[in-house]
């Protein structure tokens, strides 16, 4: 979610999507929800009330300082797992879906072109799966891999293929065209895209980014774009027997991009 525009779209549309598509579990990445920079506790609670089961984040998680406080007490708020040991909050959790399934959600951040000093995301993923394996403690496993490099995201997907239900990338704000089920049954998409105004620069008002490209001199702050938002994401049908993906498709609803709703749920 990016800014007020993205929040409004999610809060208005998500309850209907849950009802119409019979969604058992919903994950929303909210790291840009507060004006494009971080998330407040109020926004977190509003997102949960709208129907999200878990909120994931990324490199902007601490942009709103209050997140350092409420992350300690909100079980359904995740920051990247591979932050240094002792960091406030947590990076993974086991949750109950509406159908009774036990869903492990983990938030991991990439290092390529981002934060090379973070703990290794592949070692982190292995640690998470060893502690809560698919088919044993968890009926489904979802990774939000928050990263810049598509190569790092897809390699992580291959690394956990057959051991996770879904690996979905976040961070670039642009939905990719590679939604697929990998060889051993893990659904994958390099980036889910954003819930925000696509008449923008990644959800931010386009004038200041454009000015900086042209003049190299900042004139003001980046501010979230305020036009009508498009909801972007991925929908996955997971086997009750194996915990692996049976179907996966992109989800886009809104005025700017071509709309698509998974045919297997329409």
Walk through the language-model features, giving the residues of each:
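Acidic, metal/ion-coordinating pockets
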Residues: 1-266
């Amino acid at each position: 979610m990016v800014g007020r525009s993205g929040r409004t779209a999610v809060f208005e549309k998500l309850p209907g999507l849950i009802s119409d598509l019979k969604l058992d579990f919903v994950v929303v990445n909210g790291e840009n929800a507060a004006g494009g920079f971080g998330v407040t506790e109020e926004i977190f609670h509003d997102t949960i009330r709208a129907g999200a089961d878990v909120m994931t984040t990324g490199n902007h998680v601490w942009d709103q300082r209050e997140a350092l406080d409420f992350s300690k007490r909100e079980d359904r708020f995740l920051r990247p797992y591979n932050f240094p040991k002792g960091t406030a909050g947590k990076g993974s959790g086991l949750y109950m879906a509406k159908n009774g399934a036990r869903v492990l959600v983990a938030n991991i951040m990439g290092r390529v072109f981002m934060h090379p000093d973070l703990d290794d995301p592949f070692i982190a993923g292995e640690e998470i799966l060893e502690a809560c394996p698919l088919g044993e403690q968890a009926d489904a496993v979802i990774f939000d891999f928050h990263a810049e490099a598509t190569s790092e995201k897809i390699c992580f997907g291959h690394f956990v293929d057959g051991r996770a239900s879904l690996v979905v990338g976040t961070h670039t704000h642009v939905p990719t065209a590679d939604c697929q089920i990998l060889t051993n049954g893990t659904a994958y998409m390099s980036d889910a895209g954003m819930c925000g105004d696509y008449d923008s620069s990644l959800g931010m008002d386009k004038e200041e980014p454009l000015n900086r490209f042209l003049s190299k001199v900042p004139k003001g702050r980046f501010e979230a774009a305020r036009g009508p938002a498009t909801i972007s994401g991925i929908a996955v049908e997971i086997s009750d027997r194996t915990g692996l993906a049976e179907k996966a498709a992109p989800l886009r609803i809104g005025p700017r991009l071509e709309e698509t709703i998974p045919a297997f749920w329409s």
